[in-house]
């Protein structure tokens, strides 16, 4: 029952975090940010699309937590020390009165099992990993080098030495909390692996700090909500980095492929050649992607002349334009993101309602038990 209560706290906190993500995502459907691969701007994205990725990860975490909850919510009553008892105990009735879904039949495994506990902390560890990954992105986004995310002072601190510093303390704390929980998880699994299927004190040693780590996890989930709420995208900077980082170069190569019928590998070489030429001339800017440069690189790499106006080239390299061209679904295209948001809200609402009903049933059973 204690582990069941712990899972309830974690599930409630996670549901609250998904609500916050939905709220902020709905306000940033067209807020352009650069997506990154290998630490470099890659293609155009949006803040809403990023947040809904986190939202989907949390929904997956909720599924794991729910599965652990189903495993945990079984009654071991009547097993005694693992062999059962001669007392005439109505195990099914007691299980119902305590809000359990079912009874564990095998008297030995109901006492000696540790899988329910390991399943619980595994789900929590994966959830913590989700939180840490988001925190790493947010710290990077807020760095002076990236500078597309601005945290409010309520979740930052300065330096005791360097007064100009504005450190993303609350986001960094999320990563630290994850490290502590992963250490606890490793200890619990190691301890469980050394036990037998018979009851021993070793089986219960990793329970000692269980609630401490659950409380810290719940706080960590709260930090996610807080960091999302107390931050905003520097829209002009983000759009500038997205545009000037040539993140729509892939879209340009795709567009040339569709217009000319040439393979993408070839148009990729043409666009790449244009950008490399500008890099070698120390003139890397989207505005320097000219018709003459396109003509020269297409003749060099393909032996054909591809001619486009300056306006056409600039449109192909416009991040917002490239987003509207996406057709595969699930993309940062605002219409796709809006659709995912609506589906995500519906999924979260369904999970929330199921959880509410389960808690209400258990609460009702416990209240009747007291009566």
Show where each model-derived region lies.
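Internal glycine-rich alpha/beta core junctions
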Residues: 12-15, 19-22, 43-194
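A generic alpha-helix surface/boundary motif
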Residues: 1, 58, 88-89, 247-251, ...
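Short, well-ordered beta-strand elements within core beta-sheets of diverse protein domains
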Residues: 2-6, 49, 116-126, 251-262
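Short, flexible active-site-proximal loops enriched in glycine and acidic residues
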Residues: 20-37, 105-106
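A non-catalytic, amphipathic alpha-helix used as a structural packing/dimerization or gating element
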Residues: 9, 13-16, 20-23, 266-273
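Flexible, glycine/charged-enriched surface loops at secondary-structure junctions
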Residues: 31-35, 68-74, 141-145, 149, ...
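Glycine-rich cofactor/substrate-binding loops
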Residues: 162-371
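Short His/Asp/Glu-rich catalytic/ion-coordination signatures at enzyme active sites or charged loops
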Residues: 1-9, 36-53
């Amino acid at each position: 029952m204690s582990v069941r209560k712990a899972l309830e706290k974690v599930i409630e906190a996670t549901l609250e975090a998904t609500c916050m993500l939905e709220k902020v995502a709905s306000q940033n459907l067209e807020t352009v940010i650069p997506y990154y691969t290998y630490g470099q701007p890659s293609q155009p994205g949006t803040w809403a699309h990023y947040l809904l990725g986190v939202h989907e990860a949390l929904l997956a975490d909720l599924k794991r937590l729910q599965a652990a909850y189903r495993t945990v919510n079984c009654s071991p009553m009547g097993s005694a020390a693992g062999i059962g008892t001669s007392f005439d105990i109505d195990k099914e009735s007691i299980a119902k009165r305590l809000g359990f879904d079912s009874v564990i039949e095998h008297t030995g495994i109901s006492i000696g099992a540790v899988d329910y506990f390991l399943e619980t902390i595994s789900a929590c560890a994966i959830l913590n990993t989700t939180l840490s990954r988001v925190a790493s992105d947010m710290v990077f986004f807020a760095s002076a080098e990236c500078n597309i995310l601005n945290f409010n002072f309520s979740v930052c601190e300065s330096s005791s030495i360097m007064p100009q510093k504005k450190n993303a303390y609350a986001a960094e704390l999320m990563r630290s909390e994850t490290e502590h929980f992963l250490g606890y998880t490793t200890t619990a699994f190691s301890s469980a692996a050394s036990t037998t299927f018979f009851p021993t004190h070793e089986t219960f040693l990793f329970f000692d700090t269980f609630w401490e780590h659950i409380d810290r996890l719940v706080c960590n989930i709260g930090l996610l909500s807080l960091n999302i709420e107390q931050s905003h995208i520097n829209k002009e900077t983000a759009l500038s980095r997205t545009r000037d980082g040539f993140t729509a170069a892939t879209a340009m190569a795709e567009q040339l492929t569709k217009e000319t019928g040439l393979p993408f590998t070839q148009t990729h070489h043409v666009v790449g050649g244009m950008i490399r030429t500008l890099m070698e001339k120390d003139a890397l800017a989207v505005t320097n992607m000219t018709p003459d440069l396109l003509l020269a690189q297409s003749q060099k790499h393909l032996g054909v002349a591809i001619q486009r106006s300056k306006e056409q080239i600039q449109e192909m390299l416009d991040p917002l334009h490239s987003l509207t061209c996406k057709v595969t679904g699930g993309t940062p295209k605002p219409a796709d993101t809006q659709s995912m948001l609506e589906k995500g809200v519906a999924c979260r609402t369904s999970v929330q309602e199921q959880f509410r009903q389960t808690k209400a049933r258990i609460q009702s059973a416990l209240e009747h038990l007291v009566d």
